Amino acid sequence: MQHTLLVTGSPYQSKACHSALCFARAALKAQPDSIKGVFFYEDAVLIGNDLAQPPRDEINLKQAWQTLASEFNLPLYLCIAAAVRRGVINESESKRYELNHHSLSHGFQLEGLGTLVELMNSTQKIIQFR
């Protein structure tokens, strides 16, 4: 059975990103193709901000997601509208808005809600973390 993970809680004000990470690790270790993709929406898109740096004595959630995604070839999608609104932009969006920099972390990609719908329609279950 394949799952889609939908994460909506802020990485800084909720346990949503951490709980989703723990679930994803366990699921992928048990069955490497059990998760088709992770879609971050609302404040959860802040996980993909390359400029955010956690204190050294805290878990680096962004880095943990990047490592997991790399290890299992897991797509990490950020809702483009929510991300741009919160200042998380890739190089092409930076040019579009005539900015000199971008802030999207490696391993994350900006996608529209159509990608979420596609994930939902192609997996057996969607699990939301808020």
Question: Model-found features: residue ranges?
Answer:
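Short, glycine-rich nucleotide/cofactor-binding loops
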Residues: 4-20, 48-53
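Short, active-site-adjacent cap segments at secondary-structure transitions
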Residues: 45-48, 84-86
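Histidine-anchored nucleotide/phosphate-binding helix
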Residues: 16-33, 38
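A glycine-rich helix N-cap at a beta->alpha junction
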Residues: 54-84
